[in-house]
């Protein structure tokens, strides 16, 4: 019971802190040197609009993961798990975590930042579907049972993402047709990128969660963040 409470608390803190990450990421990439890059000056001159957004999103995601990797390595050293980290990399669980990290890091994280840049914070609840997608993948791959409450939660998550994603663009008189009419091409691409991020993180959660059963969580997060940052 105590582990359950601790897990729920950590999950709530994770969601709260990730919301802060999103806010700071959005603000940071709208100021300073990023503005010059988006203006197509300097090293960004000659790049297409999509190439520019993709490149900067990848850089933004990489900065986040590199900083996180440094922190996890320091923490692992403090608690005496750095040796376990080095030994675990070339094991089967370690290789699984590396593959999962590539899916969830360079691919999903970059897609998430692309979504933020092209559609704004409206994509956050869409990307947050990763937990529901991970539960579905776990049911398919590992035959994990889904209780009635879990299924209801998954349905609510999908419904909430659709409602927030659509009505975030206003409630015009034309109904759904009017809502879609208010969306720009960039916004549509951003929403698609958010779904890709949710899918990537869902896969990472399901596959990486399996590997975490054989590797300590402190070691697993080190492997994940270092792989993603590199």
Give, region by region, the residue ranges found by the protein language model.
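Alpha-helical transmembrane segments and their immediate interhelical/interface regions
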Residues: 107-123, 181-197
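Short, flexible coil/linker segments at or flanking structured domains
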Residues: 48, 100, 129, 134-139, ...
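Specific alpha-helical transmembrane segments that line the substrate/conduction pathway
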Residues: 59-62, 66, 111-145
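Residue-level hotspots within the lipid-embedded alpha helices of multi-pass solute transporters
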Residues: 15-19, 101-106, 128, 194-202
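Membrane-embedded alpha-helical core segments of multi-pass
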Residues: 21, 107-108, 130-137, 141, ...
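Hydrophobic, well-ordered secondary-structure segments
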Residues: 126-129, 133, 149-152, 189, ...
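Membrane-interface interhelical linkers
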Residues: 1-102, 112-113, 146-158, 170-189, ...
């Amino acid at each position: 019971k105590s582990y359950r409470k601790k897990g729920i608390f950590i999950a709530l803190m994770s969601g709260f802190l990730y919301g802060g990450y999103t806010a700071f990421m959005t603000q940071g990439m709208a100021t300073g040197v990023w503005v010059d890059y988006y203006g197509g000056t300097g090293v960004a001159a000659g790049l297409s609009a999509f190439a520019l957004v993709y490149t900067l999103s990848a850089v933004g995601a990489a900065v986040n993961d590199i900083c996180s990797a440094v922190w996890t390595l320091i923490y692992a050293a403090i608690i005496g798990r750095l040796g376990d980290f080095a030994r675990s990399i070339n094991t089967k669980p370690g290789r699984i975590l590396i593959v999962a990290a590539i899916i969830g890091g360079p691919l999903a994280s970059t897609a998430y930042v692309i979504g933020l840049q092209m559609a704004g914070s409206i994509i956050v609840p869409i990307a947050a579907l990763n937990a529901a997608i991970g539960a579905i993948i776990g049911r398919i791959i590992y035959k994990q049972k889904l209780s009635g409450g879990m299924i209801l939660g998954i349905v609510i998550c999908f419904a909430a993402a659709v409602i927030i994603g659509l009505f975030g663009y206003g409630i015009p008189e034309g109904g759904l047709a009017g809502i879609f009419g208010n969306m720009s091409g960039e916004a549509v691409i951003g929403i698609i990128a958010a779904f890709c991020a949710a899918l990537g993180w869902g896969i990472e959660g399901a596959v990486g969660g399996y590997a975490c059963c054989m590797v300590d969580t402190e070691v697993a997060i080190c492997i994940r963040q270092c792989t993603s940052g590199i």
